[in-house]
């Protein structure tokens, strides 16, 4: 991933800050975060971003963020302290590849507490979530047109771009306005706007730490604006979706100015219960009925994986033989039974050529299969990810054509979390 395309690709992380809230059904309206131990959610966002270096367009990126959230503990209000919950979150960020698919990207874990008003208690070592204390609700009932403010912050991961090994924290004040109820598709939501401006001078005491990472490449000033629409589902007690327009300028010590601007959208999902062990048994029976001996099913760390062995790719290429599309059409019909699940397509190569060639071919093979599943309408581009494994996970010896043919395979994982 390009450094400049990844530094501030962060808006999809906002959604994890804006969920699990409760509101009364009548006006005036009281907004509070609501917690229940064992709750799980998945948040998907899509960011379209342009990156400028000294006002010259340098990079355009389309980035997806996948966030899984688990409420592991709930703390009941006591004294002046409100209710709070402990969240265990896993984040994955991915930039769209030149082959028009999203690579299975960088992973983060974060554990934090958040109280009923939305205020965070999070260790400074965690890079995610990026936007923290948004939204925070007032301690009084609100009506249409009411406004309030609260302090918040962004925590950016600048390890790749600048060698800064701790989160880069930028504080700001958010202004909120309650706009009333709106219709979004078949649902009615409470509409809240949130806006903030940033103007932050990096403390001089941090310059030395940053300079030691990469000489001449550290931020001394950060400015920017963000305008967000938050859509509150009062029945479920969640922020159901949001959109955002943002612009951030990063002034570097050497005089270079980086500008990141774009839009983001995100939705919150509560997937239906998924039993991996049972799914494996059911898919094995179905594959047997379809007479597909080259397809195997197993439970993996990421979910349920269908391994399609002996896929007929042309040697040293990602081109599928015409007969192989029929195999994929059969697999696609199986996958239609899981419309709320995301997919991970992994490509594998035989051990021929250089390691770099093996990696490239495996990525391209995964891309071919992922795009075909999109063409068949099984999944959209934002909910299927690809991964190239090179020749690192061979299932047969590579010293014969038969073994190499088995290793030229594709695996499709139904992601369980």
Swiss-Prot record:
GO cellular component annotations of the record: cell outer membrane; pore complex
Location, primary (coarse class): membrane
Keyword Cytoplasm found: no
Signal peptide segment: 1-26
Statement: the UniProt record of this protein carries the keyword Transport: yes
InterPro entries linked: Bact_OuterMem_StrucFunc, OMP_bac, OmpA-like, OMPA-like_CS, OmpA-like_sf
Organism the protein comes from: Treponema pallidum (strain Nichols)
Compartment list: Cell outer membrane
Similarity-based family: Belongs to the outer membrane OOP (TC 1.B.6) superfamily.
Domain OmpA-like: 300-417
Domain of life: Bacteria
Alphabetic keyword roster: Cell outer membrane, Ion transport, Membrane, Porin, Signal, Transmembrane, Transmembrane beta strand, Transport
Gene Ontology BP terms: monoatomic ion transport
CDD domains attached to this UniProt entry: OmpA_C-like
Membrane topology: Multi-pass membrane protein
Pfam families per record: OmpA (PF00691)
Lineage: Bacteria, Pseudomonadati, Spirochaetota, Spirochaetia, Spirochaetales
Function: Could function as a porin.
Protein name (database record): Outer membrane protein Tpn50
Gene Ontology molecular functions: porin activity
């Amino acid at each position: 991933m390009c450094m400049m395309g990844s530094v501030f690709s962060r808006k999809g992380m906002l959604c994890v800050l804006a969920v699990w809230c409760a509101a009364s059904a009548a006006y005036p309206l009281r907004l509070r975060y609501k917690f229940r131990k064992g709750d799980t959610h998945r948040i998907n966002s899509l960011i379209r971003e342009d990156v400028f270096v000294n006002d010259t367009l340098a990079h355009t990126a389309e980035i997806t963020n996948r966030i899984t959230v688990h409420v592991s503990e709930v703390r009941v209000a006591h004294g002046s302290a409100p209710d709070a919950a402990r969240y265990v979150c896993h984040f994955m960020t991915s930039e769209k590849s030149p082959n028009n698919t999203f690579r299975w990207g960088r992973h983060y874990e974060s554990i934090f507490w958040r109280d009923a008003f939305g205020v965070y208690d999070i260790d400074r070592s965690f890079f995610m979530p990026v936007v923290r204390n948004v939204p925070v609700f007032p301690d009084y009932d609100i009506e249409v047109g009411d406004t309030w403010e609260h302090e918040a912050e962004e925590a950016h991961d600048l390890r790749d771009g600048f060698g800064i090994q701790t989160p880069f924290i930028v504080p700001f004040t958010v202004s909120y306005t309650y706009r009333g109820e709106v219709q979004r598709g078949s649902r009615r939501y409470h509409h809240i706007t949130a806006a903030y401006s940033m103007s932050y001078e990096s403390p001089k005491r941090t310059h030395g730490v940053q300079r030691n990472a990469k000489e001449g490449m550290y931020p001394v000033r950060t400015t920017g604006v963000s305008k967000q629409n938050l859509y509150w589902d009062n029945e479920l007690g969640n922020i159901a979706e949001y959109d955002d327009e943002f612009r951030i300028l990063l002034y570097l010590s050497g005089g270079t100015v980086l500008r990141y601007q774009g839009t983001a959208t995100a939705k919150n999902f509560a997937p239906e219960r998924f039993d991996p062990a049972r799914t494996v048994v059911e898919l094995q029976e179905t594959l047997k009925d379809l007479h597909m001996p080259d397809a195997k099913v197993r439970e993996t760390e990421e979910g349920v994986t269908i391994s399609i062995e002996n896929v007929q790719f042309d040697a040293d290429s990602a081109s599928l033989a015409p007969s192989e599309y029929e195999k994929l059409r059969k697999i696609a019909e199986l996958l239609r039974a899981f419309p709320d699940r995301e997919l991970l397509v992994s490509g594998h190569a035989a051990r021929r050529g250089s390691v770099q060639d093996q990696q490239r071919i495996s990525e391209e093979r995964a891309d071919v299969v992922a795009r075909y599943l999109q063409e068949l309408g099984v999944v959209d581009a934002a909910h299927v990810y690809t991964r190239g494994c090179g020749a690192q996970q061979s299932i047969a010896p590579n010293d014969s054509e038969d073994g190499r043919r088995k290793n030229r395979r594709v695996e499709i994982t139904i992601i369980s979390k």
